[in-house]
Amino acid sequence: MSKPFLSLLSLSLLLFASACLATSSEFDRLNQCQLDSINALEPDHRVESEAGLTETWNPNHPELKCAGVSLIRRTIDPNGLHLPSFSPSPQLIFIIQGKGVLGLSFPGCPETYEEPRSSQSRQESRQQQGDSHQKVRRFRKGDIIAIPSGIPYWTYNHGDEPLVAISLLDTSNIANQLDSTPRVFYLGGNPETEFPETQEEQQGRHRQKHSYPVGRRSGHHQQEEESEEQNEGNSVLSGFSSEFLAQTFNTEEDTAKRLRSPRDERSQIVRVEGGLRIIKPKGKEEEEKEQSHSHSHREEKEEEEEEEEDEEEKQRSEERKNGLEETICSAKIRENIADAARADLYNPRAGRISTANSLTLPVLRYLRLSAEYVRLYRNGIYAPHWNINANSLLYVIRGEGRVRIVNCQGNTVFDNKVRKGQLVVVPQNFVVAEQAGEEEGLEYVVFKTNDRAAVSHVQQVFRATPSEVLANAFGLRQRQVTELKLSGNRGPLVHPRSQSQSH
């Protein structure tokens, strides 16, 4: 009788302990958004590469823990190539400056871009085969780009100015089956760690977990030496031996050694001497004609090509709505939200707002992310509002202004000026208002953790509420209620009246 009773007691204690740990973990997760104050954040860490710069925000900031995201800002010099990488967290990228090309490697998709093959003998054809690869996409300033989790991608700057992009990694996304630690896996090169704070935590836990008794140290020391010989680089291929890679890819061992990149000091952004030669969806004769034209004409041509590509993607989207399913191989992954003609909300005196969500860019449905571009003219106001179903992250692109955020207790958790390069987290349902400065206005992009993020504006709520309710709720006279509901702009973009007009 005693043994079954003890077994049952042990099982009960184990289940109770597990439940307590789960409850504690859930409480900690939910408690991360109990923010008494919010700070404007700037990058905490930088990695300098041969042809660019990578900057990251510390993911341990309470604001970023609340939102469940991490951020990276990359600057790629002209002819700079950001090496192929992937992450378990889906990414949303906004192009702040410059233009370039981007390639993704979707598993199971064909290499639809091929070099034209000239007539030659079979022997010559075997020795020198034409290149082929998956689709290459152009992008430019103002584009929002969606990168699904686990999909390798590379970026190249073919412009004349630095390419600057801000990337959001949704570490709390359901697609990320690991923990909330931001991770970027590089296929090649010898990249430096982009989030050193989380690596230090992992190394500390690893040392604590692998503390061996004295009698077992000799064998473990030998294993560590063998591991160090293999892990000379920081790419995923660095962990495999050259011999194994040579066997796997059926190549020479010298090639396999280069794949491991053990002593490559160029880091994650490398310079391409002479420019990157890739297959474009145009004939060679047309390319030669373009090269013979002036620089300005070449830029006009590229803009026309981008517009044609946008139109083709729109047509494919319409075809999908008509019943022809869009495959992941040809899916539209980018949309420009900075063009004035693209504005969803517009006030000629206050500013404009554009939104990209799963309705305008269907791939965002799988990423569960969306974005908003806001440009406020001088003194323009984005009236008080809140995100109904998402956390949001406001990144200042240009200019300066003031942001005010209020929590559920009516406390002002943020009321400060913001400037170019700063990041402000706005938790779900926290009420926020933005106002541009007097000199150059305010331009910013907002990342949101829902593919169909909805916004509610205080002014809209007032107009949708019966006058008697407002009168009793705020102690207002009927004249004041009428003025509150009917005066001012219908939309959320407001240009304040001058002091003389307000009296």
From Swiss-Prot:
Disulfide bonds: C33-C66, C109-C329
UniProt cross-references to Gene3D superfamilies, sorted A to Z: Jelly Rolls
SUPFAM superfamilies for this protein: RmlC-like cupins (SSF51182)
Biased composition (Low complexity): 118-129
Compositionally biased intervals (Acidic residues): 301-312
Pfam families reported in the protein's UniProt record: Cupin_1
InterPro entries: 11S_seedstore_CS (IPR022379), 11S_seedstore_pln (IPR006044), Cupin_1 (IPR006045), RmlC-like_jellyroll (IPR014710), RmlC_Cupin_sf (IPR011051), Seed_Storage-Functional (IPR050253)
Coiled coil: none
Basic and acidic residues: compositionally biased ranges: 254-268, 282-300, 313-323
Record key words, sorted: Disulfide bond, Seed storage protein, Signal, Storage protein
Family as reported in the entry's similarity comment: Belongs to the 11S seed storage protein (globulins) family.
Function noted in UniProt: This protein found in the seeds of many leguminous and non-leguminous plants is the source of sulfur-containing amino acids in seed meals.
Subunit structure: Hexamer; each subunit is composed of an acidic and a basic chain derived from a single precursor and linked by a disulfide bond.
Protein's UniProt name: Legumin J
